[in-house]
Amino acid sequence: MAHRPPSPALASVLLALLLSGAARAAEIVGGHEAQPHSRPYMASLQMRGNPGSHFCGGTLIHPSFVLTAAHCLRDIPQRLVNVVLGAHNVRTQEPTQQHFSVAQVFLNNYDAENKLNDVLLIQLSSPANLSASVATVQLPQQDQPVPHGTQCLAMGWGRVGAHDPPAQVLQELNVTVVTFFCRPHNICTFVPRRKAGICFGDSGGPLICDGIIQGIDSFVIWGCATRLFPDFFTRVALYVDWIRSTLRRVEAKGRP
């Protein structure tokens, strides 16, 4: 018998109950190593003074700005954060890497309890030097839809299994956009027929669909790659006007 998704009303009730068991999203389970430096927009957030201490991902959307999840810096002072660009192996000092402190951060009404507006802009201490290993990614149009069935790519440096150590090199995973159990503020993904998905330790990383960042790793329900529930990403297209307005405002302040 074919699987039938729950009705929208029932799905909303079930999701509200399940959110109490939601956990920060993070690692890539069931993926594979990315080709070195093939995702030049990928950022690693680390603890300052502790090289290799990756705790969240991010995405370079402008030479001076990285997009990540708001919950990544909820309990960490920004002065303790080191942003690393151009990395493939986060445990080594690669010649392609560029390191930055955080100049300031911008939130958009983050609601931690309901896991809404899980988006944060980091202004880097100085503009990145763009190269083959460090490049920006394209933003979607405001409110651009991502249809059910769209094929996308999730990535990160988190654990590759619930009981495995964090990955040293960037991992990526092909995922499918789904609508069951999802909410309007999120994009949800699923990997059919096998145990794979995002998990703990690498929130903030991007969901890339057709070369465009459409999502930010946000949370999972009842553990990693359960094959029962989709993975939840912040829907970037809802925040494009806010992102562009913030960038314009910061750039205007910097003009003489």
Curated annotation (Swiss-Prot):
UniProt-annotated location(s): Cytoplasmic granule; Secreted; Cell membrane; Membrane raft
Reactions listed under catalytic activity: Hydrolysis of proteins, including elastin, by preferential cleavage: -Ala-|-Xaa- > -Val-|-Xaa-
Propeptide: 26-27, 249-256
GO biological process, one term: antimicrobial humoral response
SUPFAM superfamilies the record matches: Trypsin-like serine proteases
Family of this protein: Belongs to the peptidase S1 family. Elastase subfamily.
The protein's name in its UniProt record: Myeloblastin
The organism of origin for this protein: Homo sapiens
